[in-house]
């Protein structure tokens, strides 16, 4: 609720970094204006974390990346609430908390570094140096793990499963959702959380007004489940989980 969010405005900020592609979110001033236009500035202070630079943090899995490049303002925080909109994605197949912690926390050049699986950090040349699909997905998992290692156990993960389009919010003309909203899931394990959301999508029985087939096809065509499989393999978390449902009257 917006009023409750406003009340938290002094204790939390909405953070992300500039994009590695064109548009209003690639430049800090325009990015802040876009956040204001969409109402984010009304509920929290907005921090573009790479507005004043970037720094590198170590990665455990060095198959593709030597380090992770994140916004300099990450140093200002000692915990993180990773709040993601779970949906499809043109490149990753789907986007959840792992992608949010990887691409979302990376600076613009860090995004280029992940998308190219370590080939370049040059934003102007990344689209000519895109990695193979699995290498890209594995790089996302590795960089998400780097951020998890940076914060330790001080991260809460939340996926909001509404407006379940096959396309990401970064798409200027996303496809209209063909599925009904599912709910909000939270965990201290990002791998378990994304896996649970995937399972809920796959479990839908297609019916009029609630067709999961386009989203499943998007995930399958991009080999999207490899992200959680590889994330588990490198030790970011576990795909095993227990789903506990909270009814509205139980919510605090």
Across the structure, where does each feature detected by a protein language model lie?
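Single conserved hydrophobic/aromatic residue that forms the stacking wall/gate
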Residues: 1-12
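Extended, low-polarity segments enriched in aliphatic/aromatic residues
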Residues: 10-252
């Amino acid at each position: 609720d917006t009023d409750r969010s406003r009340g938290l405005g002094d204790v939390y900020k909405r953070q992300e970094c500039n994009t590695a592609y064109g548009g209003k979110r690639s430049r800090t001033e325009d990015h802040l204006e876009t956040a204001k236009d969409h109402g984010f500035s009304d509920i929290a202070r907005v921090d573009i974390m790479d507005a004043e630079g970037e720094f590198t943090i170590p990665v455990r899995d060095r198959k593709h990346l030597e380090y992770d490049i994140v916004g300099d303002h990450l140093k200002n925080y000692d915990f993180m609430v990773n709040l993601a909109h779970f949906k499809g994605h043109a490149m990753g197949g789907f986007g959840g908390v792992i992608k949010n912690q990887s691409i979302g926390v990376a600076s613009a050049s860090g995004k280029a570094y992940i998308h190219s699986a370590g080939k370049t950090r040059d934003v102007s040349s990344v689209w000519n140096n895109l990695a193979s699909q699995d290498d890209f997905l594995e790089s996302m998992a590795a960089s998400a793990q780097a951020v998890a290692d940076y914060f330790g156990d001080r991260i809460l993960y939340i996926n909001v499963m509404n407006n379940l389009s096959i396309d990401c919010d970064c798409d200027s003309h996303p496809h209209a959702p063909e599925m009904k909203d599912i709910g909000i899931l939270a965990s201290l394990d990002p791998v378990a959380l994304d896996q649970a959301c995937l399972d809920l999508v796959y479990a839908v029985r297609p019916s009029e007004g609630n067709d999961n087939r386009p989203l499943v096809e998007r995930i399958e065509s991009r080999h999207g489940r490899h992200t959680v499989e590889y994330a588990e393999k490198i030790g970011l978390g576990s795909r095993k989980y227990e789903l506990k449902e909270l009814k509205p009257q139980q919510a605090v």
